[in-house]
Amino acid sequence: EYLPIDTVYPTFNNGYSKVAKSGGWYYVLTDGDVSEYSDEDGGLAYEGDVYFDFDVENIFGDEDGNLYALGNSGPLVRWGTEEDEVLLNYCVMVSLHPSGKKAVGWSYSNSITEYDFETGTNKERVIDPVEGINSVSVTKDYQAVCGYKESETLLNIYDNNWNEVMTISSTDTESGMLEGVSAFEQTQNGWVIFDSWMENVIFVGFDGAILKEVSYEELFGTLNWPYVNGTCMDEEGNVIVAITDQREDNSCYETIIFKLKGF
């Protein structure tokens, strides 16, 4: 389902737009700026901008209605608290748990850092199956690490205690290709995997069965060089997707938002 935005967000940076849902509000990040939207008549109505004293690289929402913003190499702050509470001063990349109580940080080696904001502790962990990490996603019950070993891309899925659940490689997919997992979400029926290098969405059951692969063009009606790099879950269990797609006149890219329902 396409969610029209009543403001247009042209951008020359493909693949950097993000979306978060928190406290009944939508937040959209484009080119370092964050805007707030309400849900109105099946679309998004602009309510105002959210200001930070740094360029924002990513945004997250938690189950308690808080909004978080991550700067370039830090900081990670909780917005709306006094002076925007700083949770991490320095971090290259971070994925926040939906509770807001913990997060996973990583760079491009094969090690990650687990952050526990309740205890103020952190722990290093090596992801042995890969030589380097491309992305990490944290959902309610799972953590997904997309990395590479030699020339092969691997998606390793773990539970909250870092017990390995399964590994997906290119040989497991219908297309025979798995290149760059840019987003990963957990629904009531399984996992939704966005491979923006191949422009595919892969639906996987909790039993590990790959149920369906659908192209971005087929699912979203995208045009040229579409890239999904921002997703979140709403309160009803739908996947909210921020995608950048090239305009028909090739003048620039534009941030568009979809709601993925039914899985």
Where are these regions (language model features)?
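Structural signal for glycine-centered tight turns and loop->strand junctions in beta-sheet-rich domains
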Residues: 23, 32, 42-44, 65, ...
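Blade-level signature of beta-propeller repeat domains, shared across WD40, Kelch, NHL, RCC1
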Residues: 225-263
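Short loop/turn segments that connect beta-strands within beta-propeller blades
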Residues: 39-42, 79-82, 116-120, 159-163, ...
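Repeated scaffold domains used in trafficking and secretory/extracellular systems
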Residues: 13-21, 54-63, 89-99, 130-139, ...
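Conserved beta-strand positions in repeat-built beta-propeller and related beta-rich domains
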Residues: 20, 27-31, 38, 61, ...
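Loop/turn-rich, solvent-exposed surfaces of beta-rich toroidal or solenoidal domains
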Residues: 176-203
